[in-house]
Amino acid sequence: LIRMHIVAHSDSKLDQDIKLKVRDHLVNWLSPQLAACSSAQECRLILEQKLDAIRDETCREIEACRGNYGASVMLGEFDFPVRTYGEITLPEGKYQALKVVLGDGKGSNWWCVLYPPLCVGKTAEADKDVRWFISSLFSELKKKAEAHE
């Protein structure tokens, strides 16, 4: 599982609008590049190779929206609260994520799941695949936890 987390520069209307424009741009830009990923490791490798390009794309979008700040882009393990995506709820915890911080990063944030893709256009079949993937993932985690008890 790999999440994407975008933190706005501030909570001003302009900065929140920029965050949403950056979100739309990155989701549209990354989707075709991650479409063929068959594992979280493969997705992570592609993201690692594209960190500079992701930052450049983010900064271009900020500038196009008349923002006067930069961005930092990191790939790592970050804390997330409980989050529901449609019928799927992810528990609180540490997750691999692409974190994009706009400017000072003091504004409200937005997140989604890049792999499996929960922040791209979805179909009923894709939703079923994602539910199966997450259900399988949590079953494996539960088995490992029970084995260590």
Residue ranges and their predicted role:
Residues H9, H25-C37, A53-C65, L118-G121, ...:
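Structured segments of extracytoplasmic/periplasmic soluble domains
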Residues K13-D15, V82, N109, G121:
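Intrinsically disordered, low-complexity acidic/polar segments
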Residues S135, E146-E149:
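Extended, compositionally biased alpha-helical segments that mediate assembly or anchoring
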Residues L1-L47:
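Early exported N-terminus immediately downstream of N-terminal targeting peptides
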